[in-house]
């Protein structure tokens, strides 16, 4: 039986300076969950590690929805099968509750891609940023790259800048390589393979009234 990654939306950024990571609240599998209701469109599960959370998994399309104890929608998105697992694929949205969007963006096989946006509880845009595939040595990585903006709740621009992807020389990856003598696969540690986001070019910072308070040229 395929395992389900039943969790709150992942928003793991690789940026520096404004680094922030929102980690999953709950991981579990279909085998460990209790089916509380089954409908023509899918099944509702009670997450075993948090009885206050209920997960809906639809079959066609492969939908994922997470509800709190009051049946308020917290997260929704689409999934794609990958062997014995399901991956985030397509649009994913996290909510404050009562339909108020907190974070919205797209995934490609569990990797954030394209434009992502965060919102205040009032519905005003908080920030906008972009993820792009960065290839290094034939391996695609996903990193924040491109324009970046933050806003005050009154709509005034707070930060305006640009990120570029650079190779992090301190990063390490484990890859499988074939031993030419034995033909057996073995693990090898490869250094300096992963990209990270780095501020680039002009960065501008504004007060809530719109006054330019700081400018950098990186």
What are these model-predicted stretches?
Residues 19-218:
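Glycine/tyrosine- and acidic-biased, solvent-exposed loop/turn segments at the edges of beta-strands
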